[in-house]
Amino acid sequence: MASGILETAFTTFLLLIAVQWFEFGATAKATIAAAGALGFMLGPVVVSKVAELGWTTGQAASRLALGAAGCFALLSAVSDRWLFIGGIILATTLGTAAIPLVTQIYQENYPSRKRGKYFSSTAMIRIVSAATFGLLAGWILTNGDSSQKLASYPWWLMLIFASAFAWASFCFSKLPAKKLTGTKGTHPFRSLRFFKEDKLFRHILICWMLFGIGNLMLFPLRVEYLANSGAYADDYTLSFKPTPATIALILVFIPNAVKLIFSPLWGNLFDKMNFFVLRVILNFFFAVSLVLFFHSTSMVGLCIAAGLFGVANSGGEVAWSLWVTKFAPAKHVADYMSVHLFFNGIRNFISPFLGFWLIGLIPASNLSLFSAGLIVASSLALLSNYPSGEKVRRGAALTEEISD
């Protein structure tokens, strides 16, 4: 439940506050959108340090979440524009740094043949909480005001996010988790050696970098497209008033409602299907949803695009979170995930700045076509790994154990 509430923060509400309350410029908004990148890039360092300290993955994730809770608690008490940016950067860094540890917990507790099914089943709780909370919070933020601006600084929202992280910290501390083994080394970025030594892993990451940039470049612009539409009046005009409630409906409730339906399907397909075919199908839905979203000015068109995004994102979350468990040696899952997150951090940092810069130069509709083209091209390159995907689907080992 806590992760669903926090999902609405990082995908919608923090940027909404940046646009409609603080009225930040493009650089500040891109910084907030890219805030989690640092935590991703620090993944190898976190894994190395946790192994060195002898903590279990659950203990480490709990402490990181508790630190993020403290950041949001501070933001609930102080309404300062620069403290807001700094607090968001630190909170998201701590939150995303825990991801490789959580993936290792999945590896240890979910059987390989049913990992996708179990992941998608537990994700249902998160999806319901995200959809419900997103719609409710959007309605409260609108506050009966027909204008497009927030009526006041939503300190209560920051307090809820702090509570969600605190609850996540408690839950992590109670999870069955083990200490990391085989990850101690001479330097904290030692895990990056797997990028060099594992050819298939390297090719997947390169393709993922390209279609990830195509997707992430436009991801934060969805909030900008709706909440700051007046700044782009020469390019498009929305046929409705984008209040916080309607923005939450389009960007939070509809995608999550669709995810609730499709998440079990993608979870089962992840366990049974060729991974590369699955990833390409998901990328097709991402590309279509982006093009439709940024070519729509009506509520109907945007809602359809949001639904297609929900279809893609429901499977994308399973694939993104668990794919390394298919290709990495069991004891190196956290290492492989930390490398995946390191490169994810690079594209998470680059993409928002690139997107906010380009939308000032070309219409969002044209930018969506460029992104879709990048997604399709890199997906075709990824599909060249089809034979390897068949071996994984049949349960054959692809990666030899690499000596420590």
Model segments located where?
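Intrinsic disorder in cytosolic terminal tails and internal cytosolic loops
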Residues: 386-404
